[in-house]
Every structure is written in structure tokens, then in C-alpha cells.
């Protein structure tokens, strides 16, 4: 979740490979392990690459797709439309998907954007637009996923002082709570429908076995 230099880079764009890996980790463990593969048709996602199993498994499940059958473009920043499409494929709940943004009519991902919005994964801007071709930052992605998982601490008192902190995620930043939530493994108790209060920090899952 963080980088080797100790930063978390909340305002950096999130890549297609990073997004695939996030949703790979959100899979039910039985589904993830039952479909785990390191094989794919992409020439730019190969054996030994850190994201190979994540991308390969998610492609096998049909949740992510390449630019073409041979090109995944793992390091490219993901757009809001591409992110919405992954959300819409990942979440199998039924919805009518009637959310209508003013700038998605005729867009290649119009149906998936509407579905992802109806499911609560994504939201538009106050002016009624979705801006499908804009890139998503790491902080925005964390916030969206936390919201859907109903994992939203409401203030600093809901956190624990011994948590991992980041020099580029300050308490005054709009994304502070979302980033702390997404980057610290912990137990918690509920506060309302979507809020939570941390009760204990826990060891982070060992994801290296999937690299």
C-alpha cells in the first residue's frame, strides 16, 4: 500500500495494475484461491512480475480486460470510466443502474458507470458531471472502496495512536481518514451504518505469496 521511500502518495494516479490488485485482494478468499492463475494472454504482464497473479486471476474472472488481447498496459493510470467498469463487474448485486450524469451519454462505459453509481461505488461531481476520462488518484480510490465496504472512521478519535502514519498524509488533508483506514489492518466496532471505531491493530495479510 505504501512505497519503499515511506510515502503513500495519495495524490498520485492509480495504475491499471494497482487497481486490479486492489480488487483481487477484495475477492472472497475461496474465489481468489480457487481461480488463482499466473497465466494470461498479455505480453506486458509476465511471470515474476509483481502484479501477474492479480491481473491474470482478475482477467480469468472477466473483471479486468486488456486494451487488446495482448496488451494490458499495467502501468498506465486508470480513468474514472475504467474504474467504474471494474466496479460494475466486481459487484454482482442487482440494480437498475439509472443514475444519469450529464457527460456520459454515448460513452463506451455509460451502462457500467450508471450501474457502479447505483451500487454506491462511484459518485459524480456537484455540477452533475462524472468526468469519465479523468484519472483517479490513490486517495479517491481508497475513499470509494472504503465507502462501499462501510469502513469510514468519522474523526481522529476513531483511530489508534500506534497506527502506521505517512508523511504525505496529514490530518488536515481531506483524504486523511480514508488513507489511514485503507493502509492499517485493524479490528473495529461499528458506529452507525458506515462508521467505525478501531479497537486493535492487527498484522497485515501476507500478500507476497500472490506475487
What do these predicted ranges mean?
Residues 1-17, 24-52, 61-81, 89-111, ...:
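Feature responds to low-complexity, polar/acidic, surface-exposed segments characteristic
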Residues 139-145:
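Alpha-helical segment that forms one wall of the substrate-binding/catalytic cleft
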Residues 85, 114:
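C-type cytochrome heme c attachment motif
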